């Protein structure tokens, strides 16, 4: 967000207006709603960009509609499980569906590891972990009807001791382990798994683990696993100038390579700017929030992960990046090669469609 803000204001702002930036920290749903109301009613901001957790998204969606406040989410959705609780929002623009990386992970499991017959899962015991596991099982079963799921483990979010879980996995001896770990628990799990050689023969699919990519050091993170980076991978191509510019800016500023949240922030603000400018080109005046909201689903803008936009039911459309881990790179952490780029049309259910109905509609 800061890089976008600096660049935008340095090049004239939005229609000649300098962008003013207010920042609040996301906490509990209740407290975040209070901050959302403050930004809207006291600070009178034009748009609110952000939102990470599903619980916060479920709380913010109705408030945004009540206040008529444009809310352009990063990660947060208004899904309960895999079902959309607010299918026809006007001012709330949600992130991608929570289960997209699990869909992609299952597709790549079938592609790269077609001989897998038994699968275990270790996922955090909350909605995202359970949704990803259920989705992965449904999609993999579509491609591999004889696969058996032999173990499912549910450590609490924030768990740091996985020795008992790893022992259970070794005992079950599956062909592949699936996980939707997405934060520091990914790194901790790999360190502890390396100590007992868990992946010497076992395959793995960590559909969201790339969110902490620069902590996944080669010394304990195996090559040959499926690793997902959500909707941004810092080396997805050498031919997208915006990517090179942003990665260089981010690395200079933070001395690390950007995670996927950086692109959520960049895109949501870039989309807002483009919508304002499109409205202005039509009406010749600064548009209302209602007018901007009506245009957001009609635009596609270049972001650092490629072109991104919104579906007709206000969900983000973008690429997702997964691939096979490799140690053949100049870094001290793993990267992926090949890089599989999957767009929303491939791994996100269409507008007004239920997830499992969509999966059942696929051809064999």
Model-flagged regions — what are they?
Residues 54-65, 161, 167, 174-196, ...:
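Hydrophobic alpha-helical
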Residues 22, 26-46, 109-112, 160-173, ...:
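Short, well-structured alpha-helical segments in soluble
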Residues 1-4, 32-36, 44, 48, ...:
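Stable alpha-helical elements in mature extracytoplasmic
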Residues 2-21, 141-147:
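Signal peptide-proximal N-terminal region
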Residues 193-267, 277-283, 325, 335-363:
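Extracellular/periplasmic periplasmic-binding protein-like sensory domains
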Residues 20, 117-118, 175-176:
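Residues that mark the start of a beta-strand
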Residues 45-154, 203-227:
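Extracytoplasmic ligand/sensor domains, especially the bilobed periplasmic-binding protein
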Residues 15, 277-294:
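Short, charged, surface-exposed loops that flank catalytic or proteolytic processing sites
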